């Protein structure tokens, strides 16, 4: 379902004059940018020959004095609007006007800062609109129109600066943004004020010809005088004596020259609020939000007054320190004495004893009394009773081949080779050590020459 507008009825001159006045007041009501140095005047307004297309999407409420509905609006007509104003062409003058600091620090432009106003004619045409409208009408409040989306699809902007492409493009973008704001904020207010005039005019005509309708609101009654407690019960005092005593005592407590005045409960002093007038270093603005103040104060507190709390560390598997050095020395001596000599045919690398150890051993030997004294004949007999050293034979090498390492043989298919019994190695001249014929420390070094067996190692 759609509407068919009688567009010719809007060509009344009085309607155009009223629309121009309302549109000019709306354009000049808000604060204009400093580049515009004159009022904006509506020079020409033409709604064109083609009417918009309005489609009903939903009707929510309908009665004699109210209506609510949702519509879809499409417009591709030839309406046009021409505005006239003056702009400031000197950017230095614009900068000086927008500079809100003290004149002492402002740059003092001479001839370069003089004003240069240029007239500007701005024409808007070829308007393309497509949007969804929420329309609410009430006989008492008038007509309210709200756009749910951005209705502007395209518009053509013609101005005095069309010969300069950068300025023309800049004006095109800026005017499109302003028109979107016009449809979103200014146009609903303009239509609402016009509808109120039409509704009141219709009401005056109906009141003069017919009886007042019950739907018309009654004029408001005069304001009633407020009733106070003193009017109800004049015997009661205006102020409670208890409250007066508390107030007087509180006032007297502050009449002192002491630096430490008693504080008032549930009260905040202005001197204590100075610490909250802190400018945030990160955002560079003075905050009044209590959460921001708490955040700033806590950060300053932990930054200047206190260190960050240390983390708790737990150490485990820590060896205890040995404080007694004498116990360490005795432990080392006992371990050295109780360590058995390795029974190996290979020589061992032993460290030579220190001079202190040798000196201690000599002192012990000299301190012990010699209980047994042997004669030279007894010494010879004792040396002869020493058994000869063991026969040393070279280690036998196992030269058998492990068949599991062969790539093409398996343990299941290859028969195992039987090992032949080895003959016990008999005594030979090369492998048998002769009986000791010489006593003294050079026995082993002289009699082992020519043998492959290394001499046994001695540990100090």
From Swiss-Prot:
The keyword Phosphoprotein does not apply. GO terms for biological process: mitochondrial genome maintenance; mitochondrion organization; mitochondrion-endoplasmic reticulum membrane tethering; phospholipid transport. It comes from the Eukaryota. Keywords: Lipid transport, Lipid-binding, Membrane, Mitochondrion, Mitochondrion outer membrane, Transmembrane, Transmembrane beta strand, Transport. Residues 304-356, 368-460 are annotated as: Disordered. GO terms for molecular function: lipid binding. InterPro entries: Mdm34 (IPR027536), SMP_LBD (IPR031468). Residues 330-355, 393-405 have a biased composition (Low complexity). Residues 1-196 form the SMP-LTD domain. One of its GO terms (cellular component) is ERMES complex. It is a multi-pass membrane protein. Lacks alpha-helical transmembrane segments, suggesting that it resides in the membrane via beta-sheet conformations similar to those predicted for other outer membrane proteins and porin. Component of the ERMES/MDM complex, which serves as a molecular tether to connect the endoplasmic reticulum (ER) and mitochondria. Components of this complex are involved in the control of mitochondrial shape and protein biogenesis, and function in nonvesicular lipid trafficking between the ER and mitochondria. MDM34 is required for the interaction of the ER-resident membrane protein MMM1 and the outer mitochondrial membrane-resident beta-barrel protein MDM10. This is Mitochondrial distribution and morphology protein 34. It comes from Yarrowia lipolytica (strain CLIB 122 / E 150).
């Amino acid at each position: 379902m759609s509407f068919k507008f009688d567009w010719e009825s809007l060509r009344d001159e009085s309607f155009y004059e009223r629309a121009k006045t309302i549109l000019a007041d709306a354009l000049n009501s808000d604060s204009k940018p400093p580049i515009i140095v004159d009022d904006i005047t509506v020079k020409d307004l033409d709604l064109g020959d083609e009417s918009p297309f309005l489609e009903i999407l939903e009707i929510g409420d309908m009665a004699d004095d109210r209506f609510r509905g949702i519509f879809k609006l499409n417009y591709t007509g030839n309406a046009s609007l021409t505005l006239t104003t003056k702009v400031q062409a000197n950017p230095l003058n614009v900068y000086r006007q927008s500079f809100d600091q003290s004149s002492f620090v402002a740059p003092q432009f001479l001839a370069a800062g003089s004003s240069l106003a240029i007239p500007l004619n701005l024409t808007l045409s070829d308007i393309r609109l497509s949007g969804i409208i929420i329309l609410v009408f009430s006989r008492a409040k008038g007509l309210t129109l709200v756009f749910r989306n951005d209705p502007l699809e395209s518009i053509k902007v013609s101005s005095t600066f069309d010969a300069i492409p950068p300025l023309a493009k800049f004006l095109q973008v800026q005017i499109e943004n302003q028109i979107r704001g016009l449809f979103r904020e200014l146009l609903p207010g303009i239509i609402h004020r016009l509808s109120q005039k039409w509704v009141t005019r219709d009401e005056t005509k109906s009141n003069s010809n017919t009886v007042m309708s019950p739907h018309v609101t009654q004029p408001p009654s005069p304001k009633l005088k407020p009733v106070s407690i003193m009017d109800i019960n004049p015997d009661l005092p205006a102020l409670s004596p208890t409250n007066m005593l508390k107030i007087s005592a509180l006032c007297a407590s502050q009449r002192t020259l002491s630096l430490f005045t008693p504080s008032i409960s549930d009260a905040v002093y202005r001197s204590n609020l100075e610490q909250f007038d802190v400018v945030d270093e990160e955002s560079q603005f003075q905050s009044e939000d209590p959460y921001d103040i708490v955040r700033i104060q806590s950060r300053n507190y932990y930054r200047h007054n206190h260190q960050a709390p240390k983390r708790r560390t737990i150490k485990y598997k820590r060896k205890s320190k040995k404080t007694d050095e004498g116990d360490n020395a005795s432990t080392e001596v006992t371990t050295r004495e109780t360590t058995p000599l390795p029974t190996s045919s290979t020589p061992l690398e032993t460290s030579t004893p220190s001079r202190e150890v040798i000196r201690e051993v000599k002192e012990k030997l000299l301190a012990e009394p010699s209980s047994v004294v042997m004669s030279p004949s007894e010494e010879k007999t004792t040396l002869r009773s020493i058994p000869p050293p063991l026969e040393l034979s070279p280690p036998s090498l196992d030269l058998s081949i492990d068949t599991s390492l062969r790539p093409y043989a398996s343990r299941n298919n290859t028969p195992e080779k039987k090992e032949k019994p080895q003959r016990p190695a008999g005594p030979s001249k090369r492998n048998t050590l002769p009986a000791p014929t010489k006593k003294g420390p050079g026995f082993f070094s002289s009699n082992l020459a020519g043998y492959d067996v290394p001499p046994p190692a001695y540990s100090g």
